[in-house]
Amino acid sequence: MTASTRNGSPSPSPAAPTATEQESKSMTTTPANPPETKSQTNGKGSGTAQSSQKPASTSANAKDPLRPRRKKAKRACFACQRAHLTCGDERPCQRCIKRGLQDACHDGVRKKAKYLHDAPNEALLPGIRGNYYNQANTTRNIPNQRGNASNSNSNKVSRQSVSSANFYTPQAARSYNVYVQAKSQQSHVRPAVMQDASMNPSVFHAQSPSSTQNFDLSSNPQTQNLSSAMSQTASSVSGQNQDPFGAAFFDPSHPALFNFDIASMNFGNRYGALEFGMLGHMATGAGDTPPSDSATQRGSIGRSSGTFTAQNFGDSANNQSPFLFGDPVLNDWNPTGQGQANPRNIYNQNAVAGQMGEQNPHAFAIESAPMNFASPSSTESPQMTTTTPFDEANANFSSRTNLMHPTNTPQQSRISTPGLKHQGLHVGVKRRYRSPSSIYESVKEPYSYTSGFHSLTAFIQRRFSPQKTLQIAKALASIRPSFIATTKTLNQDDLIFMEKCFQRTLWEYEDFINACGTPTIVCRRTGEIAAVGKEFSILTGWKKEVLLGKEPNLNVNTGSSLSSASSVRGSSTFTPRNNNTHNSIDPHTGMPTVGGGGASGRTQPVFLAELLDDDSVIEFYEDFAKLAFGDSRGSVMTTCKLLKYKTKEDSAALFHGKEETQQGGVDGSSGTGTTTSGDVATTTATGTSTSNGANANTNGNNTNPNDPSSAASSSASSALQGPQQSPRQTWGKRGIAGEAGMNQLGFRDGKVECSYCWTVKRDVFDIPMLIVMNFLPCI
């Protein structure tokens, strides 16, 4: 049989291929023979594929080694695959053209591997691979591969439309335009997509990148037909249970996946912001995770399960902006500093059809702009701003809204976020942005811990008795060799770096102290206070400026029972060794200094030993000696007694108040307006009243402790006039409430009994850097 006869024959039978085809198959698959065998083979006729590709002069020498090798096709057509012949990449291929089968030439289907047995055929097409997302819509449109020529022709168009309607193509990812079909193909794909009963309209409310693309529904008349068709489809499937999480949520090739606005995320570096954005995307966009309020607290648009109708595309009656995704938070998402635009301009006109029909992956940006959840008034139209400029070509959108008629289909219930629409809820707005770079720029010299330990030693010798001083000295002496061993190799730069580490760690703890409602202080390893919370000041009466050494320390309360009497009458239990080395007041600035150096002296913060009574100080330094170079993660939980802040005037007023109370208890009354009820009485500046209020005298500015207003006023006056509480105060069943109640703690003997927990944090040189302490009063 000649080659011309074979080219004119109909489609070859798969059961009995011709002898020439078998010969061609053997010629294309059998390796080259020895030279003597090749001379015998050259006399035979060449195969069909060789005769179609090579001219007649070279067809007689099919096994010539100098003949250029044919390039293998990526996938053979259906006819060549059945005939086991070599095909080309072009469609239709040359063999089908010569045989008159160009209309039925399409890619053949290979046998799938075992691990791809459950994968649909459309996902295995060339160029698709991992970009297949909507299996439910494509399994119904698998082409009939064994049909006749007319069915194959129609299925070819349907397959091309479906594959392009369900996958991301590389061209779409680069050009941000995923709707790239021609007009002839759009007429075929839209009825098939609209009439498919498995179409899920609720996925159109899923999140999408709100800061990447722009769209306008009016520029393309075909999208208007899409909107009208969508309204009919939504009304027919609104009663069915919808699954908005059918499509994949992660596509690494999507251009908007890593489109994070780094400047608005309050991160100091790009890598931390990208990591946070990716974690937020994975957490809020998970396929099996239902929508929640947490998904919108960082600026992401959460999923909703509402029904997709044409009303989401058209303008409302009050000229309000349409909401494509049905999320009420999208209405208030108004980044500061951006121009106002309409939500319908978020995507471009071609991307809308891609979002609607192609089931793109649900990738979106996290915190793409500073958050502002302020709710607009009922008379204002909701507005939203985007990061893309306003397209002036979309200005005629309002003139074409008559083609989009809203339907009366009731939307399904969705989770709203009314808590976010509160005027006082500004995530990240109230927080003052601080940069730690100022710490590294401001620290120029190391901190003098030597002067701090000298001042601590002088204070301990001045306040404590020799026996108690010896106990504290033994505890500090036990860790002195460890301090020497860790610091002897440090130079000037290391000490400066150590101070920078301390200031940087303290910078982090300031936010913790402000956010925590527990009385907290942070001090150095010398015991000098470095940071304090306002709750601690309320509890003890120590002002923050006094504790940090910015104001003079006039406290005379040392916890001794004779401290107040000694300050008034001038008596003391023992003579201190050095009275002029600590807390000397600078005559020019009025600030406490070290060493009495005047204006050139170093300001001295308050030591931790000044805030505790004698027994608590000894117990603290014994525990500190065990924990300083011991367990780096260890902590101590015990009880202590905090000393209230008292000046000489406070102690004198309290001492005279006790004498008047004793006289009033003997005489029954006094000329200064003192009344008693049993043995409990309180003293004010102009008069006194009983604590229970039963026999209260109305002389002067007497207050009733049971009255909240009077309690607040008494606390305010006590802050200015000193402690005014009797030594025996009883509390009711309600206990202590508010600042006033905390101020009244410890007026009996100037001590507040507390339970406290503290730990030691070390620096990079494994040296104790700071001590963090939390207190809770025992009521």
Curated annotation (Swiss-Prot):
Residues 1-70, 135-163, 202-239, 285-344, 401-421, 559-590, 655-732 are annotated as: Disordered. Residues 77-105 bind DNA. It is found in: Nucleus. GO terms for molecular function: DNA-binding transcription factor activity, RNA polymerase II-specific; RNA polymerase II transcription regulatory region sequence-specific DNA binding; zinc ion binding. Its main location: nucleus. It comes from the Eukaryota. Residues 25-61, 202-226, 291-322, 333-344, 401-416, 573-586, 720-729 have a biased composition (Polar residues). GO terms for biological process: cellular response to starvation; gluconeogenesis. The keyword Transmembrane does not apply. Residues 227-238, 560-572, 672-719 have a biased composition (Low complexity). One of its GO terms (cellular component) is nucleus. InterPro entries: ERT1_acuK_gluconeogen_tf, PAS_13, Zn2-C6_fun-type_DNA-bd_sf, Zn2Cys6_DnaBD. Keywords: Activator, DNA-binding, Gluconeogenesis, Metal-binding, Nucleus, Transcription, Transcription regulation, Zinc. The keyword Cell wall biogenesis/degradation does not apply. Belongs to the ERT1/acuK family. PANTHER family: TRANSCRIPTION ACTIVATOR OF GLUCONEOGENESIS ERT1, ZN(II)2CYS6 TRANSCRIPTION FACTOR (EUROFUNG)-RELATED. Transcription factor which regulates nonfermentable carbon utilization. Activator of gluconeogenetic genes. This is Transcription activator of gluconeogenesis BDCG_02812. It comes from Ajellomyces dermatitidis (strain ER-3 / ATCC MYA-2586).
